[in-house]
């Protein structure tokens, strides 16, 4: 997910994206625990995407309060 794409999204879209990423992260952790994980790098990528979405979400909330 690119920063440019996140800036263009609304708060609701970001919240939906965050929920989707958290669900994917849960599934990846489950796959890792059961030994079925094929792409280990995806865990890191999803974790960073979650951080990125949270950062932009926080910025949007802060901007709307000002």
From Swiss-Prot:
Pfam families: Ribosomal_L29. One of its GO terms (cellular component) is cytosolic large ribosomal subunit. This is Large ribosomal subunit protein uL29. Keywords: Ribonucleoprotein, Ribosomal protein. GO terms for biological process: translation. The keyword Mitochondrion does not apply. It comes from the Bacteria. GO terms for molecular function: structural constituent of ribosome. Belongs to the universal ribosomal protein uL29 family. The keyword Nucleotidyltransferase does not apply. The gene is rpmC. HAMAP family: Ribosomal_uL29.
């Amino acid at each position: 997910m690119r920063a440019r794409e996140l800036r263009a999204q609304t708060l609701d879209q970001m919240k939906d994206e965050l929920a989707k990423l958290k669900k994917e992260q849960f599934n990846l952790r489950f796959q890792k625990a059961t030994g079925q994980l094929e792409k280990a790098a995806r865990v890191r990528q999803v974790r960073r995407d979650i951080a990125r979405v949270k950062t932009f979400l926080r910025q949007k909330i802060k901007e709307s309060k000002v």
